[in-house]
Amino acid sequence: MQHNSLIARFARGNLVIQILVGIILGISLALVSPSSAESVGMLGSLFVGALKAIAPILVFILVAASIANQKKNQHTHMRPIIVMYLAGTFFAALTAVVLSFMFPTTLTLVTGAEGANPPQGIMEVIKTLLFKLVDNPVNALMSANYIGILAWGVGLGLALHHASDTTKAVFEDLSHSVSHIVRFIIRLAPFGIFGLVASTFATTGFDALAGYAHLLVVLLSAMAIIALIVNPAMVYVKTKQNPYPLVFQCLRESGVTAFFTRSSAANIPVNMALCEKLKLDEDTYSVSIPLGATINMAGAAITITTLTLAAVHTMGIEVDLMTALLLSVVAAVSACGASGVAGGSLLLIPLACGLFGISNDIAMQVVAVGFIIGVIQDSAETALNSSTDVVFTAAVCESEAQKAKG
């Protein structure tokens, strides 16, 4: 009986506080016993694995069900959300350019990224994305190709739009069932994050990052400006309301888990649950959240821009204003295609370096620096990318609700 009441108390507890306790315990264990901390890393791997396993099915079923059950004259407001996604990514690249000029970073270049295979140009990134769009649906689900999953989910949903009510009800019930599984997995987040934090501190330590402190400060400052100034400003323009309660809730409930899982895909179920909690329109968020995990890449744009300009400053290359603006556009477009590149934003750095005539050898050394600081850079980038998906979706839903009220 005591055992059951303990589980019930845990299930009813505040998830954010439980996650914070997990973080503190993880750091403590890493300091006291690094070997034990590495062992509990399996808890983190299991948690991330469970999220990654459920996410493709969740997206496919939710998108198909929401489109199949969509009533006539019901709008999903995707256009303003996509505009906010793209504008936010461009502003992120622009912010990184400004900070990189104000506080120029030079790098001590290292080797170690020779095995990586960056795309040869923007057309290759676009080509990869187009082929992901027409991927086999089973393969898309198996390989977590969200562009393909979205395409097939939308296609099936449109086809089922004319199906019988019984068939539509089956998909609706399936979406509720998958959502229940997601809620159960998210309740286990404190254990997963405890394992992730403990193993990260035990295996990485932070001595390796000390030499790149200046670069990290510029990167994290740009991300903080986007999260705490630019995004709230965009939300205010859209809703004419105080944006900070929404922004802080999204950072707390989406950003924290994204920071430790370091995976936008794994955070899709967390974001879906948060949208449900915020009582947003399911037809809208079931499409906008997985789409955001694919194209809303403010953090990636900052990483590409900052590391490229660090390479430029290291090589002593002069950059004029127009080239810097062009870099912002290239970084924003490349970042939107980051999901089409194995290795994500870091492997798009050589593409941006090509603007300045920097050789591939040097560019790959900059990528290696990115891998060294990745434990912080990738975590912060994912937290910004993923929490922004909910911020912008909620802003548009609120704005459209205001218009409907007149």
From Swiss-Prot:
A cellular component term, taken from the record's GO annotations: plasma membrane
Q: Where in the cell is it found?
A: Cell inner membrane
Citing just one GO molecular function, the answer is: neutral L-amino acid:sodium symporter activity
Q: What is its main location?
A: membrane
Q: What reaction gets catalysed by this protein? A: L-serine(in) + Na(+)(in) = L-serine(out) + Na(+)(out); L-threonine(in) + Na(+)(in) = L-threonine(out) + Na(+)(out)
Q: Might you name a Gene Ontology BP term for this protein?
A: threonine transport
Recorded hits in InterPro entries, A to Z, give: Na-dicarboxylate_symporter, Na:dicarbo_symporter_sf, Ser_Thr_transp_SstT
Q: Which cysteines are joined by disulfide bonds?
A: none
Which family does the UniProt entry place this protein in? Answer: Belongs to the dicarboxylate/amino acid:cation symporter (DAACS) (TC 2.A.23) family.
Question: What name is this protein filed under?
Answer: Serine/threonine transporter SstT
